[in-house]
């Protein structure tokens, strides 16, 4: 077991167990479970700046390397668009889709982001919705780049179906994270984007308009809706300086925006976070000190109140409760974390110490 839990909670609180630890010879950019399998994908950058994609399978209490493939550029982010098709963003601004059973030729490849004059620009974040994955309707992929642009792609065409960027090129900020949500029908899509200056923006794809924006005061490392395929409920935002924000998306106040709760976590940057697929009110956060923490969001008695003077509805934020002791998973910052969609509590973690770890978090179904 790893992590600490008080004696009073030791019989009921979730516990962290390391299933296997795997050293790699590259810097991991992202890890993802291959849908419906006991295998996971690890992608990153080799010392010579080439990209590498590896598939590992859990078997006999170990991680066994199934395949390893080199690609031209270092991989920065990934998302599965079908059970065996993965979309990769790289350090040279390309978006590529590969079949995990063959990486010799991409199924789709386009330069998604580039600076003026064709200068090098990386894809900083990626997400997808629709197709055979979460949500309904056609497959759409969103990418955010260091050129300050957020673009939505349909793999059936090589041009973006939507591009969000500031009119003034001097105001462009690095986009560090993107996420889809609100995919309740074939036409309904909402995307969230976080930027290095703390900006958080929500856009509606159906109307191609910015719905809401705010500033989290610190660079935004991760945004994630609690579910992609339901009506908007909550948005999780993690930032530099150890901050976590959870916005209640049910009620938008014209002046105050969405209500949110603020929490200070870890002792450094909260690099990433992930909602538990089996319970959208539970999520894990990963810190710059290598810590992993589990939280549960608790709703208030009333999520909406009326302003006595104007009569306008205002949201009421909930509270965050740590439900497990902090686990010292790695010696360096945790770069990527992914829950298994079918096995509650099974997770894979990648950190900057060039190590992949498969963890089992127990008792989550009892929370």
Give the ranges of each region predicted by the language model.
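Intrinsically disordered, low-complexity regions in plant nuclear regulators
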Residues: 302, 314-317
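WD40 beta-propeller repeat fold
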Residues: 2-205, 211-230, 234-247, 260-278, ...
């Amino acid at each position: 077991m790893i992590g600490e839990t008080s004696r009073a909670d030791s019989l009921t609180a979730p516990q962290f167990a390391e299933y296997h630890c795997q050293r790699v010879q590259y810097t991991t950019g992202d890890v993802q479970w291959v849908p419906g399998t006991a295998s996971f994908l690890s992608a990153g950058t080799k010392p010579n700046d080439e990209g590498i994609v590896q598939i590992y399978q859990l078997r006999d209490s170990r991680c066994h390397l199934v395949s390893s493939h080199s690609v031209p550029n270092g991989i920065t982010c990934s998302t599965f668009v079908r059970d065996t098709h993965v979309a990769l963003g790289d350090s040279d601004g390309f978006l590529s889709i590969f079949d995990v059973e063959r990486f010799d030729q991409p199924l789709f490849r386009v330069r998604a982001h580039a600076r003026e004059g064709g200068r090098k620009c990386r894809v900083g974040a990626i997400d997808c919705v629709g197709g055979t994955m979460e949500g309904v309707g056609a497959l759409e992929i969103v990418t955010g780049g260091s050129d300050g642009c957020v673009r939505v792609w349909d793999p059936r065409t090589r041009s973006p179906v939507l591009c969000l960027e500031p009119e003034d090129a001097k105001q462009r900020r690095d986009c560090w994270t993107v996420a889809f949500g609100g995919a309740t029908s074939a036409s309904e899509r909402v995307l969230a984007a976080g930027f290095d200056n703390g900006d958080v923006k929500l856009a509606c794809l159906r109307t191609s308009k910015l719905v809401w924006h705010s500033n989290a005061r610190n660079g935004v490392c991760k945004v994630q809706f609690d579910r992609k395929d339901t009506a908007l409920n909550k948005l999780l935002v993690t930032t530099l300086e150890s901050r976590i924000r959870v916005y209640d998306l049910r009620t938008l106040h014209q002046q105050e925006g969405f209500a949110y709760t603020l929490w200070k976590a870890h002792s450094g940057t909260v690099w990433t976070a992930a909602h538990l697929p089996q319970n959208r009110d539970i999520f894990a956060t990963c810190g710059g000190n290598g810590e992993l923490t589990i939280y549960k969001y608790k709703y208030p008695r009333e999520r909406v109140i009326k302003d006595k003077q104007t009569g306008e509805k205002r949201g009421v934020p909930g509270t965050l409760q740590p439900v497990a002791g902090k686990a010292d998973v790695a010696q360096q910052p945790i770069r990527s974390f992914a829950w298994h969609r079918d096995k509650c509590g099974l997770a894979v973690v990648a950190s900057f110490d060039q190590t992949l770890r498969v963890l089992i978090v127990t008792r989550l179904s009892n929370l």
